[in-house]
Amino acid sequence: AGAACSTIGSTGVHMRAVKDSDIKLRGNSGYVICLPADHMVTQVQTNMAATLNIDWALRMAADLMSETGHPHDYADLVARIDGWLARSEPGQILYHPYISEAGERGPIVNANARAGFIGLSSGHRFPDLIRAVVESLGMAARDCYGAMDELPKELRLTGGAARSRALRGILAAAVGAPVRVSAREEAGAAGCAMMAAVAIGAYSDMESCVSEWVTPLLGDAETPEPDLQATYSELYPAYAKAREALEPVWDRLAAHRDGADAKDDASNPTQGGS
């Protein structure tokens, strides 16, 4: 496997460029996008929610503080994340980042999937929960690249969350590869422009376009911390097994929600004229 690219924003998008003969599909998840390069495609797996999980946790804290008469600025809570990560131990709690009400779409497709913590004890505090949520983004990235058959040898990052050095370290350790951050803003729009530039002949091929548009804007490689990488390699199988074991639980909860909604609809029929 070569370099791959992940965009860690509200959602998570994980991509690798491969020859069309090397496409590896898992079930009904993922996408394949044609590229303006001979026999090359982009294979993609996406998470319904990435930093939305962090937003949820921080807004829970902000709501609680507001109710007790201590309103807090959300941006200030975001600025505290790296400090909370530094004060907590890696790999103590599992969290599946399925906070979207639409469930998950990569690498599993399950509208009933829901987020949850595993491994809580009375000794855990808010920084431990934040760490578990942030670590889940690394686990989700590893999950998605595993579904594409190979983990990358280098991971290139875009998206707002890539500004956090602590998060970059977690992602590097989770996928077991150095990470590099692109300084280019709006990378998706730039990619569209690059494809158009090749299509109209402004560049002879995609490689020459990449050499000018992408490579000069990449930051230095940040290698994974060995102990953290070992921790996540040990933790990932438990993350995957727990996800599989939870599927019937999600289904039962969804059936309960649907039943409750049906009762509400029956007790509050729509009023209308005949």
State where each predicted segment sits.
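Active-site core segments that coordinate phosphate-bearing ligands/cofactors
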Residues: 1-264, 268
